[in-house]
């Protein structure tokens, strides 16, 4: 982690009594609740953000993918063809009155701006049920007989509770698909869970590899032609519930091509660990037929809303560069309250922003780290130099409101040497006296997000109101926070990506105040920047 040091003068802000948009004294986030914190000082000055074009539809995220209406969930791994990325996600056009999902299609040239291309694989068309998660691939070797470079998709179909795998082919480069003859290519062997095929080409063995979710296990299969599949092995888990949406891929540790580790990733249930549903990952070895883990799983994202995640490489870069990092996207929602969220003209949450996933050595061990996509920088104003420095003794209120629409808040949180704080909190106004908290617990060395006081928390299930946190050691007494906020989401990247927390949130219209609190000591906010992000809503055809 690199601490950003400001060259500007610092602002020393002491607590004072004042009228503010939210009440800091209602917090109590630590295991040992602090005494009530006085209201923030109205005299402090924060960096002044410039104007930004808000999301064109009120209530819609400015940056995140949402469906045109009805219901969205699982993203499908994108592929690159003819200068465009092709992304699909599950979509139910009949929600809430009817069931079943199809594959909805979007395209992009930069993984930031997306164009709506409509439904690509329709549900209930081949007599085998609706369309669930799977994989789109480019068959460069013409293994399936549809021509070199044909776009094909393998996806789970479900009818009367029976899950099978079907093959679909596209004659127009992935915009529409037809069901292949002979479906299903993988009939159900008599098990309740048999779903979400993740397929990739194994060049070393000239065959396709599939990872398939099978209850508490991931099954591995190979095929020469995407039709005939041979079982190879199974990786079984304990205490993580029914697995969904697996992924298998290699990454180089610290960009070293001589130290390549395989990653097995899957949607899982962390309730037995005091967590919630999320994305679990194991590091280990893959020999072409079986995966062997080097240890216990880690959670790719410690927030409550990052599920059904998938990764992919950029085929335009070298093999060595493909091992350095991968793109990552997930579904920002949680089945424990997915249907309870407010649904103005669509439901199901959003897809996360595209991220970059890498392996870095942390405390002597390889660990997955997640960073925002570099392309997001193009949405921010030109760099205006170092940010502001603020000293917070108890509480502080920014005099300038947060930008309309999406924004990015970056800061290094440091403890004062003479009077080190136990905990630091950034409080983002959610309106009507409610707020969202992003903070760091220096005593427990954990970064956390709390939305138990956002605009809808009072009516939501307990799993929504639970405070989520991730372990993160400070670097020389400081922690970097990179926070991206959209109309219904907060994504926190801490410590250079060593900890990530993604949350669906809800605010009242016009809620733009914010401040900070320092518990049991003094906090220094270094190089504090608040940048508006230009709106990039899904472009309609």
Task: Show the residue positions of the predicted features.
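Secretory targeting and sorting signals
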Residues: 2-43, 48
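Hydrophobic alpha-helical segments with strong N-terminal bias
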Residues: 15-18, 57, 479
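Generic N-terminal initiation segments characterized by hydrophobic and/or small/turn-forming residues
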Residues: 19-26, 60, 399, 522, ...
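Beta-rich carbohydrate-recognition and catalytic domains
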Residues: 28, 33-197, 201-244, 252-302, ...
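Beta-rich accessory regions
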Residues: 257, 285-295, 300-308, 313-541
């Amino acid at each position: 982690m690199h601490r950003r040091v400001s060259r500007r003068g610092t602002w020393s802000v002491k607590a004072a009594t004042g009228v503010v948009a939210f009440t800091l004294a209602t917090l109590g986030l630590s295991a040992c609740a602090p005494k009530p914190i006085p209201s923030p000082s109205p005299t402090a000055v924060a960096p002044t953000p410039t104007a930004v074009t808000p999301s064109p539809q009120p209530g819609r995220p400015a940056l995140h993918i949402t469906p045109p209406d009805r219901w969205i969930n699982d993203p499908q791994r994108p592929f690159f063809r003819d200068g465009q990325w092709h992304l699909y996600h599950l979509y139910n056009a009949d929600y809430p009155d009817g069931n079943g999902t199809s594959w909805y299609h979007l395209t992009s040239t930069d993984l930031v701006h997306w164009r709506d291309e409509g439904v690509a694989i329709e549900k209930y068309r081949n007599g085998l049920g609706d369309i669930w998660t799977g994989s789109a691939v480019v068959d460069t070797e013409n293994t399936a007989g549809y021509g070199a470079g044909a776009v094909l998709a393998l996806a789970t179909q479900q009818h009367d509770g029976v899950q099978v795998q079907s093959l679909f082919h596209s004659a127009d480069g992935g915009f529409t698909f037809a069901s292949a003859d002979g479906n299903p290519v993988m009939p159900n062997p008599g098990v309740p869970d048999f779903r979400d095929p993740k397929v990739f080409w194994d060049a070393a063995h000239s065959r396709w590899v599939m990872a398939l979710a099978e209850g508490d296990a991931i099954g591995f299969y190979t095929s020469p032609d995407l039709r005939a599949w041979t079982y190879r092995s199974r990786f079984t888990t304990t205490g993580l519930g029914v697995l969904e949406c697996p992924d298998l891929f290699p990454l180089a540790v610290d960009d070293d091509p001589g130290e390549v580790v395989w990653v097995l990733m899957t949607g899982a249930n962390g309730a037995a660990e005091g967590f919630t549903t999320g994305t679990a990952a194991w590091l280990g070895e893959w020999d072409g037929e079986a995966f062997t883990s080097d240890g216990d799983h880690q959670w790719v994202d410690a927030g409550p809303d990052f599920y059904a995640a998938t990764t992919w490489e950029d085929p335009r870069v070298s093999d060595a560069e493909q091992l350095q990092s991968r793109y990552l996207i997930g579904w920002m929602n949680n089945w424990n309250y997915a249907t309870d969220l407010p649904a103005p003209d669509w439901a199901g949450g959003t897809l996360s922003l595209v991220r970059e996933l890498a392996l870095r050595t942390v405390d002597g061990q390889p660990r997955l780290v997640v960073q925002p996509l570099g392309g997001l920088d193009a949405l921010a104003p030109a760099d205006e130099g170092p940010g502001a420095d603020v000293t917070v003794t108890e509480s502080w209120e920014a005099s300038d409101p947060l930008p309309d629409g999406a924004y990015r808040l970056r800061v290094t949180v440091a403890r004062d040497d003479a009077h080190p704080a136990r905990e630091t909190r950034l409080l983002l106004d959610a309106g009507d006296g409610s707020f969202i908290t992003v903070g760091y617990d220096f005593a427990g060395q954990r970064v956390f997000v709390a939305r138990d006081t956002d605009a809808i928390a009072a009516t939501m299930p307990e799993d929504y109101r639970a405070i989520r946190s991730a372990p993160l050691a400070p670097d020389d007494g400081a922690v970097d926070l990179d926070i991206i906020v959209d109309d219904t989401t907060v994504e926190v990247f801490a410590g250079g990506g060593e900890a990530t927390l993604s949350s669906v949130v809800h605010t009242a219209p016009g809620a733009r105040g914010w401040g900070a609190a320092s518990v049991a000591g003094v906090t220094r906010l270094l190089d504090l920047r608040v940048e508006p992000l230009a709106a990039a809503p899904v472009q309609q055809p």
